Amino acid sequence: MVKAPAVVIKLDSITGLQSARILSGYGIPVIGIVDDPSHFCSRTNCCEEILAGSTTDDALLETLSDIAGRRGICALFPCSDESVRVLSRNRESLRERFRFVLPDEHVIDLFMNKINFYKFARDRGFAIPSTFFPARREDIDEIAGKMNPPYIVKPAEKTRRWIELFQKKVLKLGSIGELDRVFDACLDAAGDIIVQERIEGDDSRLYSCIFYYNSGCEQYITFTSRKLRQWRIEDGDACLAEECGDDEVLKQTIELIGSVKFRGLGSLEFKRDGTSGRYYMIEPNIGRPVTRIGLVEKAGVPILYAMYRDALGMSLPSDVMQRHTGVKWISIINDVLSAIAYYRKKQLTVREWLESLRGVKAFAVFSLRDPLPFIFQPFNYLRNYLGRPEPGPDERSHGGR
């Protein structure tokens, strides 16, 4: 029996690459859509086709229409927030020729917009960092009177303009004066912004629960893990992570997600305060895999395969329980960069770094069967570094990213 193809949208990302490899490993034909054909992840050999086209706007629909005309019914796997938004907006017209599992539009709005999410979590009694939603310059005075620096500033929703200007997902500001200096630029880049207190603790205090709720909105898979390091440090994506059991993370995730009618894939990140030990909800990711999706698969939990079968109306795999074997996952080059940064800050020794690599069994980019992405990764990074724009106002005051 011929299997329906899986279309990985935003293959040119570490998340997209891992998703394509995982699905291909189950014998599923994979088609990738990339914004950047020269990206190192676009060099993978695990796709039958790789098509160039926008994944961030409705131009994606033209590429999907071309695929459907040639390949018939396909299952869709968006691997970025922007592609989740495009599919959600056009879900009714797409359902004729594609199969996918996404939360309802109002649930996506609730979780993808951080202002909506933080208000929702706070109103239901969950702990979040002290948070402000400044819209006017006068609001800075209120922040100064109620919150001590450093301040974490982030957009309500990720925008291309924010990344172009600041070259990072969030800003860490050391004084109210710094916040005042970048305030207008932040509003211009994002529209709506969030200012939060920084929860004490290093990268290893960042925990998450990755979950899948089936098309009937029933809890089906949960998987808890934690970051050990991330790149960029303190505000980036995981580059070294490990499977771990954490009852509190699991409990709070189930309580929060259970309060809405949820279906599909998602994750919820927490930070455990280094002083009090209290868990704070940091952010959700919904409708798509996260960077460490390869860790879930290597630990024996077939979450993407379950999503594929669910989307196509097939029976779901039965063996989906987390085994808590302590598997570690690494993005090698990113972890080397992270380790160097921590070494320079005198927060990590070479010996400590080498010891932290024990137990690594899953790799984000490296693969003997699919070697080109790893080979081309450093060249892509060098190209991007040499082609970086002038730093934004925050970077001029902090020495760049």
Regions of interest found by a model, annotated:
Residues 228-232, 236-240, 285-299:
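Glycine-rich phosphate/pyrophosphate-binding beta-alpha loops
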Residues 1-103, 138-142, 359-360, 366-399:
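ATP-binding N-terminal substructure of ATP-dependent carboxylate-amine bond-forming enzymes
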Residues 173-232, 243-254, 271-275, 279-280:
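Phosphate-binding site of ATP-dependent enzymes
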Residues 309-401:
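Peripheral (often C-terminal) accessory segments that flank ATP-dependent C-N-forming ligase machineries
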Residues 194, 263-267, 317-323:
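Flexible, glycine/charged-enriched surface loops at secondary-structure junctions
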Residues 176, 290-309:
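Gly/Ser/Thr-rich active-site loops/lids in small-molecule metabolic enzymes
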Residues 108-194, 215-216:
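Active-site nucleotide/adenylate-binding loops and adjacent lid/helix of ATP-dependent enzymes
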